[in-house]
């Protein structure tokens, strides 16, 4: 009997922010089993084939696939000097049988490689004939390319290779193949892999009321914690790490024009966007180690000043969040309460609102 991934609404950016345009899970699903709404997502039990591709595509891990329990798989894999993952539809043999090779995310693969564990991916040559192949092959390509991006920046000589056997080697599950030389690393065109995680452009975003944001406790994801293990390297990186759609992490930056509305911090599901304030000061901070690159902060930003940088720097864990924007608090001349304003003002927004209400009632 087929089961379907568990949906955890409080982690979903579409649930957290009603107007989110995130469609990563639906884009990754080759069976059109996912329905999107401003309440989140709904999975069709009839259409779902439990390939786990939707779960792998979700940066907040709102979808949990029981057919691919990542942490349990890693716990078994790290006990071996080498491990072969075989996709279930190919019926090939392997140490771990997974529903689709594309569901093995870059963080998992890079983590194993960083520990010197050689990884073989058996069954990729069957993608063209597989029921999951419509997006499974694209996702696999995306993840393998992301691993090579990591290898080029945080990797070292002890990193093991990730092999994709040719047809003749698939039964043995061994190969000296370098995946960077195959078609799996082609550049995508049209609605390509790099578009799967691209945030909505600011020009298409619409101002939204704060009631569209549902608050929930922040959380961390297993995939982001695996990435941070790789990022916490003692040596200085030779070059900044290029942002990549297969790496569920991002560095947020800000342009001039922040209104201190705090919508980004309210919508952020992981607590990467933070508001810190004292009696006299207000600050918007960003904690890179918590960011999964979901992009909801960019979507919800009403003045459209937040954006993702093209590169990521200072990857190691920092003792405190980086300051994106800071303001001094002002005191209202009428009610004497402290308030925040992007420009000097005599009275606070509450008193301004009272004045507007009074004027509308009495002219």
Model-derived segments and their meaning:
Residues 41-43, 281-285:
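Minor-groove-contacting beta-hairpin "wing" of winged helix-turn-helix DNA-binding domains
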Residues 27, 67-69, 277:
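Alpha-helix capping and helix-coil boundary motifs
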Residues 1-62:
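Extreme N-terminal leader/targeting regions
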Residues 34-35, 63, 273, 306:
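Conserved hydrophobic residue
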Residues 46, 67-82:
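ABC transporter nucleotide-binding domain
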Residues 53-71, 300-314:
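Short, structured interface segments
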Residues 1-23, 77-281, 288-290, 296-299, ...:
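Non-ligating segments of multi-cofactor redox enzymes
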């Amino acid at each position: 009997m087929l089961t379907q991934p568990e949906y955890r609404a409080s982690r979903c950016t579409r649930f957290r922010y009603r107007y989110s345009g995130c469609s990563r899970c639906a884009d990754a699903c080759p069976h059109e089993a996912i329905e999107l709404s401003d309440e989140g997502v709904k999975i069709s039990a009839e259409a779902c084939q439990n390939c786990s591709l939707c779960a792998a595509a979700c940066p907040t891990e709102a979808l949990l696939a029981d057919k691919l329990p990542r942490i349990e798989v890693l716990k078994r894999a790290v006990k071996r000097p080498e491990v072969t993952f075989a996709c279930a539809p190919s019926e090939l043999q392997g140490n771990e049988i997974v529903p689709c090779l594309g569901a093995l995310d870059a963080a998992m693969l890079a983590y194993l490689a960083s520990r010197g564990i050689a990884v073989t991916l058996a069954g990729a040559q069957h993608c063209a004939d597989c029921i999951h192949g419509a997006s499974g092959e694209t996702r696999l390509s995306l993840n393998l390319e992301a691993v090579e991006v990591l290898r080029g920046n945080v990797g070292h000589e002890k990193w093991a290779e990730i092999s994709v056997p040719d047809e003749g080697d698939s039964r043995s599950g061994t190969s000296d193949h370098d995946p960077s030389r195959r078609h799996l690393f082609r550049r995508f065109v049209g609605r390509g892999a790099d578009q799967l995680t691209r945030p909505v452009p600011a020009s298409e975003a619409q101002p939204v009321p704060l009631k569209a944001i549902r608050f929930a406790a922040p959380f961390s994801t297993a995939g982001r914690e695996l990435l941070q293990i790789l990022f916490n390297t003692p040596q200085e990186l030779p070059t900044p790490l290029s942002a990549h759609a297969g790496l569920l992490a991002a560095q947020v930056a800000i342009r001039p024009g922040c209104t201190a509305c705090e919508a980004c911090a309210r919508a952020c599901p992981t607590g990467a966007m933070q508001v810190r304030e004292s009696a006299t000061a207000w600050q918007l901070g960003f904690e890179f180690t918590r960011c999964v690159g979901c992009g909801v902060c960019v979507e919800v930003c009403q003045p459209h000043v937040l954006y993702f940088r093209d590169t990521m720097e200072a990857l190691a864990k920092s003792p405190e969040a980086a300051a994106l924007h800071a303001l001094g608090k002002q005191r209202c001349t009428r009610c004497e309460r402290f308030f925040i304003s992007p420009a000097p003002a005599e009275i606070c927004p509450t008193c301004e609102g009272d004045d507007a209400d009074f004027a509308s009632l009495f002219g």
